[in-house]
Amino acid sequence: MPGRVEAGIPLILLLAAAAVEPLRLLMLLALVIGFVATVRVNSPTAHLYGACALVVLSMVCSGIAMPASARDGSTCASVLAPFALYRAAGALLVLGAVALVLRSLGSTGAEIGVRRVSPKGVALALGALVAVGIVATFIGPALAEPFFGPLPVVLGDLSALLPALLFAVANASMEETVYRGVLLRWVMRSHGTAVAMAAQAAAFGLAHGVGGDFAGSPLPVVAATALGGLAFGAIALRTGSLILPIAIHAALDIPIYYANACLQP
């Protein structure tokens, strides 16, 4: 079991990266160096460095600047919509890095909640995706208005549903795997469930509180997202799988695509 100070360093670097966007590349480099060094000496903190590095990598990928056409509404219904493709490419990079870290540590997907799911579990996840997605798509703009101001989005164009689903599933798969998969599970090893839940929720909330076009203070967004992180974490621990958190998260992300890629001129 690593010492408290030693085990706390990667978490401090993670929270710094989440709160201060310009620090993310530097914190990612520090965490990768820490991961390589701790793997070489077979230190138990290797899992912490690996988990935190993967989360910061997802933040960096999510923050990559997109072309102007991604947000002007002109590519809203295109299957090649940049807003969807950029996120899908980032998700593939992050999930590939997750596989690499798992292999380096001799771990398996089942250890982080990536496991075979029963037909009943698949049906539940699909049902949640459809039900929550429909509700979120039509009431999401109204709920988001206090945080981001009016969102003049076009929701009636069903041809935009395919790129919206691509964006939503890619983003949810990436974030749930790193936050509720590796981070939650591996922080639990050294710090226990309560600290792990708090750490992943805090990082999740802080990461969503920077770089946005907020109508006022970002603090309500940070708080709401952190509460969402707690809920997703509880579901992941309760079910032992990431499929239901991914489905619900993806459903909630569908209106985010519309709000960013389908803005009216």
Predicted ranges, named:
Residues M1-G106, Y257-P265:
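N-terminal, membrane-interfacial amphipathic/helix-forming hydrophobic leader that caps
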Residues A7-L29, L126-P265:
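Transmembrane helix-loop-helix hairpins at the membrane interface
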Residues A37-G50, E111-S118, L184-R189:
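Membrane-interface helix-boundary motifs at transmembrane edges
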Residues A70-A91, G96-N171:
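Juxtamembrane helix-loop-helix connectors linking adjacent transmembrane helices
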